Amino acid sequence: MQGRLSAWLVKHGLIHRSLGFDYQGIETLQIKPEDWHSIAVIFYVYGYNYLRSQCAYDVAPGGLLASVYHLTRIEDDVDQPEELCIKVFASRRNPRIPSVFWVWKSVDFQERESYDMLGISYDNHPRLKRILMPESWIGWPLRKDYIAPNFYEIQDAH
């Protein structure tokens, strides 16, 4: 089933894939990484002026990584704002997705956290560096194939 926004994207020749609707009726679209920045600008111009959240997850051990964006169209005199979910999948070997920092500034720390925990590199992000883990940390802790280092020195301290 295709939603109103998905139909609009098809009408204008913008490549995407509809992933259906969630339990609240919010449409989820899959966008290719190479198309994401230009489509993000189009969504902003279309009225999706608020990025509610961004998160990322590991789809499966050895599989793709996903970056998820929840967008909201906030307008005056509207009781229920229009919402949209975008999923951008990236290869595990070279997980690169264009940053949308220059479209929605609120994504700053969220993209940094996704980089820190999963190793997704957000191209053109102005400050893409670790935000939770020390800079010296090796690996990406939320990947399903991550092997945790031994922490004997911390255990011995007690």
From Swiss-Prot:
InterPro entries: NADH_DH_suC, NADH_quin_OxRdtase_su_C/D-like, NADH_UbQ_OxRdtase_30kDa_su, NADH_UbQ_OxRdtase_CS
Gene3D superfamilies: NADH:ubiquinone oxidoreductase, 30kDa subunit
Catalytic activity, as annotated: a plastoquinone + NADH + (n+1) H(+)(in) = a plastoquinol + NAD(+) + n H(+)(out); a plastoquinone + NADPH + (n+1) H(+)(in) = a plastoquinol + NADP(+) + n H(+)(out)
Single biological process term from Gene Ontology: photosynthesis, light reaction
PROSITE patterns hit by this protein: COMPLEX1_30K (PS00542)
UniProt KW keywords: Chloroplast, Membrane, NAD, NADP, Plastid, Plastoquinone, Quinone, Thylakoid, Translocase, Transport
HAMAP family, per database record: NDH1_NuoC
Protein's name according to its UniProt entry: NAD(P)H-quinone oxidoreductase subunit J, chloroplastic
Organism of provenance: Solanum tuberosum (Potato)
